[in-house]
Amino acid sequence: NEEERKLLPENFSLGNSNYFARFRETMSGHVPEQSIQKYFEAQSVWDDTMATQAIRILQRNPQQILVVIVGDFHAQYGGGLPDRIRQRGFENVYVISQVDLTELSEQEKSSTVIPHPQWGPRGDWIWTSGNPPISSPHQ
C-alpha cells in the first residue's frame, strides 16, 4: 500500500534479472514457487536499505573507508548490495568473498573460485580457507 511504499529506500528498485535468477535457483525447494517473487522483493528491500545506510555513512565521512560485512549472497556475482551502492554514485566498491574449501571436492573447489559461466566472478577477491584447487588457473 502507499503508506508502506513511503518506508522504502529512495529510488528503490528490484534486483536485476541475473540476481533474480540466482535467487530463484537458491530458494527453489525452500519456499513455495508462488512466494519466490515476494521473498525476492524483501531481499531487494534489504539490499537497498543496506546501500542507503552505507551511502549515508560515506557521505558523512568521505575520507573514510567503509567495510560492510554481509551474507555472501548479498554481494557475490553482482546484482545485490555492491551494485546498489555503485548505482548511487560510489564506484570504489570491492567485494571480498570468503569461501571454506575444506570439505569440497576438487571439482567443487574449482567451480567455486573460477568465474561462473553465467554469473561471472563471485567477487573482486576470493579469500579461501582449506586447500585451494589443484588445477585452478587463478592461483
Predicted feature descriptions by range:
Residues 1-55:
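A substrate-binding/cap region within the structured catalytic cores of diverse enzymes
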Residues 45, 49-60, 64-67, 73-139:
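C-terminal regions of proteins
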